[in-house]
């Protein structure tokens, strides 16, 4: 537990120190956020707020992992697992950076082309699956919350490699893009992720995956430090650079700890946000009417009169409740 706390503390401090250095730089480079004209009118004042701020806490997290790695008498076993989580997070961060760069520099409103983003995400997810099974010897089993059951080929459900590969790709892409969708209000994605990642760090420790917990702890510390600049009124946005990295890292941790199903509970806020978009699109195509005033769901609550801070704090609270519920699902496991 101590290495996890050290990683979180170092990432928090590095992020806190980097903020006043990087934010003015992003301003000078004119990496400003473009705000949707069809969104809540109060968001128009956010136009020009620097984006791509995810580089701040990603650097902080990476620095923290390096510090823990070189601590005298530090944890050595399982470092490849932690490195894999960090690599997936940084890989998605690079994709997000390229997407943000295309938006703010090349003035492409949607960033990278859809097929470019999809290809990059799939390649990273496949690399994760291959490494987890053939290098880490993870197997194709997964944990079932509240049951104490490890579902495995031949025991209860024969997943097999190809099914596992498909599930992994889906989990990684769904999680990364769900966190990306949630990043629509000041502090919403960073705070919600921090709660979920802390829960998965606990799962990792229970599963004796200390290095996975260390990397998650570093990301949590980085996000908490980032909130000092990202909570309302935000001085910087994480952009796709940050949100895709966080989702990628969280999904990688879930895959390595065999707790993909726990994502449905612990990451419930991300699931709900994504479902609100899917429901809105399908219902509108079928009926020509909308279920929500706007999707994702956080914008709906804004448009019914909630303040931005109230929406964010409410979603954080829901995320905390779901995280506790998910951890309760560990009963009988480990």
UniProtKB/Swiss-Prot annotation:
Major site of localization recorded for this protein: membrane
Cofactor dependency: Mg(2+)
UniProt-annotated location(s): Cell membrane
Top-rank lineage group of the source organism: Bacteria
Disulfide cross-links: none
Protein name: Phospho-N-acetylmuramoyl-pentapeptide-transferase
Pfam short name (any one): Glycos_transf_4
Protein purpose: Catalyzes the initial step of the lipid cycle reactions in the biosynthesis of the cell wall peptidoglycan: transfers peptidoglycan precursor phospho-MurNAc-pentapeptide from UDP-MurNAc-pentapeptide onto the lipid carrier undecaprenyl phosphate, yielding undecaprenyl-pyrophosphoryl-MurNAc-pentapeptide, known as lipid I.
Listed transmembrane segments: 2-22, 55-75, 78-98, 116-136, 154-174, 187-207, 211-231, 236-256, 262-282, 311-331
Annotated metabolic or biological route of this protein: Cell wall biogenesis; peptidoglycan biosynthesis
Alphabetically ordered keywords of this record: Cell cycle, Cell division, Cell membrane, Cell shape, Cell wall biogenesis/degradation, Magnesium, Membrane, Metal-binding, Peptidoglycan synthesis, Transferase, Transmembrane, Transmembrane helix
Keyword Cell cycle found: yes
Enzyme Commission (EC) number: 2.7.8.13
Gene from which this protein is expressed: mraY
GO process annotations (BP): cell division; cell wall organization; peptidoglycan biosynthetic process; regulation of cell shape
UniProt keyword Cell division, yes or no: yes
GO cellular component: plasma membrane
GO molecular function, one term: phospho-N-acetylmuramoyl-pentapeptide-transferase activity
């Amino acid at each position: 537990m101590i290495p996890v706390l050290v990683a979180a503390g170092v990432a928090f401090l590095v992020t806190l120190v980097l903020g006043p250095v990087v934010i003015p730089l992003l301003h000078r480079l004119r990496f400003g956020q473009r705000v949707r004209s069809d969104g809540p009118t109060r968001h128009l004042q956010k136009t020009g707020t620097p984006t791509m701020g995810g580089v701040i806490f990603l650097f902080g997290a990476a620095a923290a992992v390096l510090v823990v790695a070189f601590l005298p008498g530090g944890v050595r076993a399982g470092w490849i697992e932690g490195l894999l989580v960090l690599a997936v997070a940084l890989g998605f961060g690079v994709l997000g950076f390229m997407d943000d760069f295309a938006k703010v520099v090349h003035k492409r409103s949607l960033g990278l082309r859809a097929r470019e983003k999809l290809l990059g995400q799939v390649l990273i997810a496949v690399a994760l699956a291959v490494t987890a099974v053939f290098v880490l010897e993870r197997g194709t089993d997964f944990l079932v919350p509240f049951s104490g059951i490890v579902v495995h080929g031949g025991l209860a459900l024969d997943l097999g490699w190809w099914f596992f590969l498909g599930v992994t790709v889906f989990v990684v892409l769904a999680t990364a893009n769900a966190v990306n969708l949630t990043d629509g209000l000041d502090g919403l994605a960073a705070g919600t992720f921090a709660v979920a990642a802390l829960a998965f760090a606990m799962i990792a420790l229970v599963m004796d995956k200390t290095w996975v917990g260390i990397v998650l702890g570093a990301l949590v510390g980085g996000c908490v430090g980032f909130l000092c600049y990202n909570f309302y009124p935000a001085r910087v946005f994480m952009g796709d650079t940050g949100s895709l990295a966080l989702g990628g890292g969280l999904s990688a941790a879930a895959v390595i700890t065999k707790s993909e199903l726990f994502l449905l509970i612990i990451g419930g806020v991300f699931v709900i946000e994504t479902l609100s978009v899917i429901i809105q699109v399908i219902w509108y195509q079928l009926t020509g009417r909308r279920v929500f005033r706007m999707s994702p769901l956080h914008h709906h609550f804004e448009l019914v009169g909630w303040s931005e801070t109230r929406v964010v704090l409410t979603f954080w609270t829901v995320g905390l409740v779901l995280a506790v519920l998910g951890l309760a699902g560990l009963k009988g496991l480990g």
